[in-house]
């Protein structure tokens, strides 16, 4: 069983900043391209979702990807491009899952690790008071 512990990251500016469970991940596309990116462990996200510009960094051709419509806070609808990617969390915790890319995440500047692919396969412990969280292979 493998376990990784991450400190919470501070997101935002000045008195608007909040500490959140962020993991430094490596996204690996089937073409072999990879990019390091931050992702929020989000229990409310149905699946893993990243900014659209990450798909471009990975060299993915949007015209060749499956599309879907996703909704988030405020029920805003976003066109989302989907592909299967490998996500490396470090320390040998690696998984392949369907990932969405949408311009709706570009402003956030980070991705989401959601239920499908992530929470369904790993035990995740949040210790908000200590500002740490841990991911453990099941």
Protein language model features and the residues they cover:
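Pepsin/retropepsin-fold aspartyl endopeptidases
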Residues: 1-138
């Amino acid at each position: 069983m493998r376990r990784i512990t991450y400190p919470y990251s501070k997101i935002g500016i000045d008195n608007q900043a909040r500490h959140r469970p962020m993991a430094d991940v490596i996204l690996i596309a089937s073409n072999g391209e990879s990019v390091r990116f931050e992702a929020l462990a989000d229990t409310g996200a149905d699946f893993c979702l990243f900014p659209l510009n990450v798909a471009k960094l990975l060299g993915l051709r949007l015209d060749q990807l499956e599309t879907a419509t996703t909704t988030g806070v405020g029920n805003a609808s976003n066109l989302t491009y989907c592909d299967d990617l490998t996500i490396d969390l470090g320390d040998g915790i690696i998984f392949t899952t369907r990932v969405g890319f949408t311009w709706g995440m570009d402003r956030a500047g980070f991705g989401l690790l959601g239920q499908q692919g992530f929470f369904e396969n790993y035990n995740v412990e949040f210790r908000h008071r200590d500002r740490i969280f841990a991911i453990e292979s099941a």
